[in-house]
Structures are given as C-alpha cells and as structure tokens.
Amino acid sequence: MDCQMILNAMESDYAGSTIRQTYMTMGTFFKSAKDNGFIDRHPMDGVRYTKPVRAVDDIHFLTVDEQKRFLEAAKGSHNYAQYALILETGLRTGEMIGLTWDAIDWEKRTLTVNKTLEFRYKQDEWRAGPPKTESSYRTIPLTDTAYGILREIYDTREYRNESNGLSTVLTFMDRKTGQKRKLVMRDLVFINWRTGMPAKNSSYDTHLYKLCDDAGIKRFCMHALRHTYATRAIESGMQPKVLQKLLGHASITTTMNRYVHVTDDSMKEGVAQFAKAQEAQKG
C-alpha cells in the first residue's frame, strides 16, 4: 500500500484538516498492526502531507451589516434562495446541493439532512454520499424565512427547465444503516433554471465573488455563510449545545472554537450588560 500516494490523491478534493485526520488515523492503525506483529514495517515511515490546515483566524464570517448588503446584492440572482437558506439553517454546501423534496416535512416544518451531493471535477461526475459524520445526520426546524424559501421553489417547480441528466440515479452507502441508498437527481430542490441541472460546487463561489464585489464587501466562500449562521445564532442567545446539534457537530469544542465568532458589536453589548449589572449591584 502506497500511503503517500493516497494522501497526495486527497489534496485536490479534501480540506487540509481532513487529510491531517486521515494521516493520523493511518499512522495509529499501522502502528498498532506493527506492534501486534501483523506487519514487519510501518508503511507510514517517511510519509508526509503538505496541504496546510486552515487556521481558525482565517475563517471568514459576515457582520450584520455585511450580511444585509450581501443579501440585497443577491436579490434577483439565480442562487439567492440557496444563499439565504444556508444563512437560515447552517447547512453545508454539499448538504444544500443534495437536498431533496422528501427530506422536507411541510407539516412539521423541518428539514432532514441525510445525504450530500457534489461534483467531482477530476472524475467529471456527480457523486452522492452520506453526511460528513454520523453526527451530521440531523433534523432542523425551519424558520419562517427558510420555510418560505422552500415553499416558493416547491410551488413553482413545474415551470423549471429540466435536463436529461436529471434522470440519473446515484447510489451511496448510508453511514448509519450500512445499506445502499439512492439519490434521484430529479428530486433535488435546487436546479439551475438555465441548465436544468444542479449548480456545481465551485460555481457558487465564483458567483459569490461577483456579488461581494457588487455589495462592496470582502470576498468570501460558501462556507462563510455557515459560519455566519452560527455567529448570528449565538448573538441571538441560542445555547451552544443547541447550535452544536443544528450544525451537526459531534463535539461542542468544534462548534465554539471554529464556528462561533465574537464580533465587535457583541463585545460592546457584553460590556454594556456587565456595566449595567455592576451598577445594579451598587444599588
């Protein structure tokens, strides 16, 4: 087994943090195998990964003002609903692209995350898969705004352009059950009105850059919308444990350290609340 080749192949499709975790898992696995006499040589000796892990401070999120300016610039654009939905639910990009109508319960006003979809450029194909981790399987209560976004798309779906590619049925292994599942492309919520197919992952970022320029704000990528959702949730008073479940994190540490950001406004508000409490104690 060429462990270096495996890590090198991951660099085009996976984040540095994922590659690092794979590197560590492989190292632990083979060390145990060697220690127990199953193999003579540790296959990870001399193996390195080069893709850097993005620092927490590099992760961007929008201020309240930037969020308003961005949404204003995005109004009327073909991807507005997708951007707005992530800001209301905290979905990952692949979870949003892979969202199908059967995952939405109109009566309970919930959205269930149970699959993902992404375009693999190296293989030139769409690939369905399970959510990122077992904790990523979750059911999210919909805000009125999120419900309205989805309802409008559902009520007008018969007018959308549909490509022959929507007849494609993709299969993937369900992480929770170990059984094969199907994703029917025609059942996807978000279909590009022009192409009749779902928009590819990278096309969202390209479109975002133009909207950022139009709004006069710093450019950001799709994942920043998820970070922004988390930050707004904490600012609104949501309990971190609740946010952890909504984001699909196994650990509260991930939620707090990576996705929750302290803004200047929230610091000022915190100090003001502290000062008010101090004055009240003085009588």
Please give the residue ranges for each predicted region:
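C-terminal secondary-structure termini that scaffold catalytic or DNA-interacting sites
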Residues: 108, 119-121, 125-137, 144-146, ...
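Exposed loop/turn and edge beta-strand positions of beta-sandwich/beta-sheet ligand-binding modules
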Residues: 56, 79, 107, 136, ...
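Active-site/catalytic core of tyrosine-dependent DNA strand-transfer enzymes
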Residues: 143-217
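Catalytic-site neighborhood detector that most strongly recognizes the C-terminal catalytic loop/helix
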Residues: 53-54, 61, 117, 228, ...
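N-terminal core-binding DNA-recognition domain of tyrosine site-specific recombinases/integrases
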Residues: 1-38, 196-203, 218-224
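Short, contiguous acidic/charged loop-to-helix segments that flank catalytic cores in large enzymes
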Residues: 127-137, 191-200, 216-224, 262
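Basic, Lys/Arg- and aromatic-enriched nucleic-acid-binding interface segment
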Residues: 16, 20-22, 35, 39-99, ...
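C-terminal catalytic core of tyrosine-transesterase DNA break-rejoin enzymes
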Residues: 17, 35, 84, 88-95, ...
